[in-house]
Amino acid sequence: MSNFFKICCVKDPGGSAKENLRKMDQVNGHFVSATCPFSGESVELKVDSNQKQVKPNLRIKVPQPIRLKNHVAHDENFDTLHSRINEVTHFNTKCSEKVCQTSIMDIPGRGDTPRTAEEVFKDAQAFLTQYYASIKRENSEAHKARLDEVKRELKERGTYQLKTSELVFGAKLAWRNATRCIGRIQWKKLQIFDCREVTTASGMFEALCNHIKYATNKGNIRSAITIFPQRTDGKHDYRIWNPQLINYAGYQEPDGSITGDPARVEFTEICMKLGWKAPRTPWDILPLVLSADGKDPEFFELPKEIVMEVQFEHPEYDWFKDMGWKWYALPAVSNMRLACGGLEFTANSFNGWYMGTEIGCRNLCDESRLNIVEAVAKKMGLDTNSFVSLWKDKALVEVNIAVLHSFHRDNVSIVDHHSASEQFQKHLENENKSRGGCPADWIWIVPPMSSSLTTVFHQEMALYYIRPSYDYQEPPWKTHQWTKSDGTKTVHRKFHFKQIARAVKFTSKLFGRALSKRIKATILYATETGKSEHYAKELGTIFGHAFNAQVHCMSEYDMFSIEHETLVLIVASTFGNGEPPANGVDFAEHLFQMLYNETNNNRGDGTSDLGSGTFKTPTPKSLMRSNSMMTPSFEYKRQLTRLESNKSSVAGASSIEQIGPLSNVCFAVFGLGSSAYPKFCHFGKTVDKILGDLGGERILELACGDELYGQEQQFRAWSSKIFQVACETFCLDENGMVKDAKKALGDVPLTEETVRFGKYQGDTKLKAALEASFRKQLITCKVKENKNLGDFSADRATVFVDMQPETEFKYDPGDHVGVLACNRKEIVDAVLERMKDVDDYDKTVQLQVMKETLTPTGAIKTWEQHERLPAVTIRQIFTRFLDITTPPSTTVLKYLSKACTDQNDAAQLKELAIDSNKYDDWRHLHYPHLAEVLAQFPSCRPQASLLAALLPSLQPRFYSISSSPLAHPHRIHITCAVVVYRTQNGQGPMHYGVCSTYLQNLKPEDEALVFIRRAPSFHMPKDLSAPLILVGPGSGIAPFRGFWHHRKHQIKNLIPNKQKPGPVWLFFGCRNRGMDLYKEEKEKALADGVLSKVFLALSREDSVEKKHIQTLLEDEGAEISRMLLDENGHFYVCGDCKMAEEVQQKLKEIMKKHAKMTEQEYEEFILNLMDENRYHEDIFGITLRTAEVQSASREFAKRTRQESQKSQT
């Protein structure tokens, strides 16, 4: 170790070096610099009483690490945390230079004097620095603004409020800093119940009953803390008078003996003085004594049904259970003060679970407690007359064996002292790595039995106190200022738990709602079409009955907050062929990064097992896009449940490495997707797996909703189940509002009485209305040309549309254009004819929804603007804003059944809404639009306003841009396959694709509204020398037309003889030569050298061998392999998902054959291509143009679903 004390003195007896030094002063024969080189302070010569000059003390202390040895492992570590005065808030010990007082019971506190604003701000500053550092925002604008906010609150009110996330962080950190706790390795797994809104003792009681029930969890103990309002002026404190929430009473008998627990005699007398009628048995549960807002205390008897007790028996001694000894399962400390951020929370209760010796040694065998050791020894037949027989030790061991055995028998969480010691050693190692130290009180950490046999006995520890912290405080009966002179109260309250759970028994309805919403439920969604958002908001409405439900889009969510969440629900769509929607990409990458960081931290060497050989470690993006849900080879270990980790002394030691960053987060995932895609619900599955790998507690298995088979019914079933499970998890199942929510689960969310078309004064432009509804900046384009490509037929056409935008815009080849289409006029007119509450379809109206707001004076109902639909005419709503061509959802059918006057119509609609199989068959056979449904059930006359609120939005359709900004400035070209098909297996009415037929029918000078969606993963490489392999059958050629036009202009700008463009190979497929799109253009590009080779696969050409694109790829496999491996080639695929899957499988065969790759090497190879953005996919769903394709698609989707279900089991 280097010298940590520097002395700023130089001795120069000869004076030869004097001129080389700064100005020096001479003190007792030494030359000393006039200023200290470390502090810059000037030197003042001091004179003692004998007029002798005294050398000033210029020693500068640099923080010195404390070396801590382990005398068994023969290793050492160095504690530096104690010296980081700028990062942590210290408070002093009672020890002096001459006397060590660490064995004194009380940790020094600061008394009950309220803190000054200056003292509070100093601690707040230190705490907020730690908080913002934990979320990687230290010294950010948010950090500075928060400090300013705290300073302003302190100036105005003398105190401030911690935000919920800050309180959660502080409560966990206080446990982490608890010097006397051996079980701190679990510090991240602490459920916080924020009860700072509670104002009465009865409210405190209800909250603590909920805490007991939640934490007990039928024996599978969960760590939790309930926190009540902070101290303000010291005159309005909240206090829990009980040392623990559950305690046995102790009674002093006339003969001096004690019945019950001797440690609770004083508090028992307090309870009796307050009016508690004590049964005076050895095992009486003491009532809770609570005081709120500085008022006199009230006592409340705990319901017996929420207090779990363990009756003791011994595995070998039958007489042991006859002794009648028992103990409560939940150790919930309630007499300490939480100091956090300068604030003091005088009323809080926290719990972990027992270490066996806490009961077996301290509670049962201490002489000052139940002291059963002699009774046990005599039952065992031991000689109790001589210490030499070690009868106490033998009896003590058997008592502890009985305790562990009985807890294990009842499946109640407990940990033996050896496992706890191993866990603490691991915690010590983790803390030294993560923050350079761990404050620990050796006297308390070392177990009271078999001390030297545990690892912690031989471990040196550094004891110091840092905040946030849990501090001892004076018992409230010693400090309380009574309003009654005799200090008594006669109110006696005794409740059953069902009464307690109904908050209205104690408080107003408003407060009851506040109590039920202490637990935060964060609902996150990622969506492309808006369906996930709709489901997420619906889920938020359901959870809002019983939780503090907050709904966020993933792109708007602060990912650094996820570690501090309590309950996270994910509703996530999958976009394209397995990728996240655009607003879910950052969320996914952050999750992957968390997993990488956690894994590397666990490894300790900062390396990763991902990848091998010459391939790079795959990035989150490539893992998300990969062909199957790739799992990193490090395979993060499964998170054990609390019961698994602690019910066995063996399991306790083995589970200590399983605590991930999300260990305290409960979660569930609902994935949306289409089984027409091979990577069905891939994004949802990936998120579900990573959340679990990061330590999250999955409270319900992943559910997948299939767009092609009962997605809505699957969501309804899942939402009902997850709500029930969440309520059970957080012990809200008896809450009255929970019952209301469960009742509302099966109802239509809106009614005819809560939705209306309101009057609107003003003029709304259609473009502005669409921009507001779809949250997009739209571009108005004029059609310049619209023509058919290839051979035209009624049921199979592809059109080319040339548009000229009216404003400036930017795009790159490979990007998409979103088109806002119109519903067909005949369908809109047929629907409007059946509406019953509209007299003028062309008058501007505002769709309004009734909202109910709960206030202290009652519920207030107001009409508010619908969040999705702006003020336009009803005809415009059904033409431009609502999807009326997709078969109605079961929610809509449920409402339509209520709008029928004929009972048979109503019954049939209701049956379709309830029976998912019948609905699915009806949907696929008829694929009816709304007008056809109304025609099928003629007595149905719905209300237009309610129907508008229930129908989904008409989503924009996306097309790959077929032009180049270099070749076609100020233009956008679209290549669109027109969708036309007959339902009912080809025998039904003709159906038309909404957007494709809209584009087909546009005439020159017609206007269309569009927007650009970037597709950076499908752009052309900047390196023109890179080979391009383009694969696109049918309309999949669309983006590649833009590529070759763009490439032609790029080649013009190349320096002759210095830059050579790489080869471009185009693989195109169609049925026959008449459908060979852009044939002349391809031939010209080939002649100009822009395209190097063009391959044509004809699948139904007469007199020609039938071929598919995959066959052509196989024929050119050797060259493809060479271009990808040796020339950094790029591989592009555009087409439907089935084709894309088949192409990738063919590429796998090619690389195995020509590059001699194994399965694992190919997986790493494809990941590497994706990482380098050299494998590109532009995928769309299978177009249901014919009965043949529709049937094939459904069979393919069925197989995908079955394979997906197998992979989940």
Swiss-Prot record:
Enzyme Commission code(s) on record: 1.14.13.39
Cofactor-binding details, from the entry: Binds 1 FAD. Binds 1 FMN.
Expression by tissue: Constitutively expressed at a low level in the larval fat body, hemocyte, Malpighian tubule, midgut, silk gland and adult antenna.
Residue numbers spanned by region Disordered: 603-622
Reactions it catalyzes: 2 L-arginine + 3 NADPH + 4 O2 + H(+) = 2 L-citrulline + 2 nitric oxide + 3 NADP(+) + 4 H2O
Binding site for FMN: 527-531, 669-700
Name used for this protein in its record: Nitric oxide synthase
High-level lineage: Eukaryota, Metazoa, Ecdysozoa, Arthropoda, Hexapoda
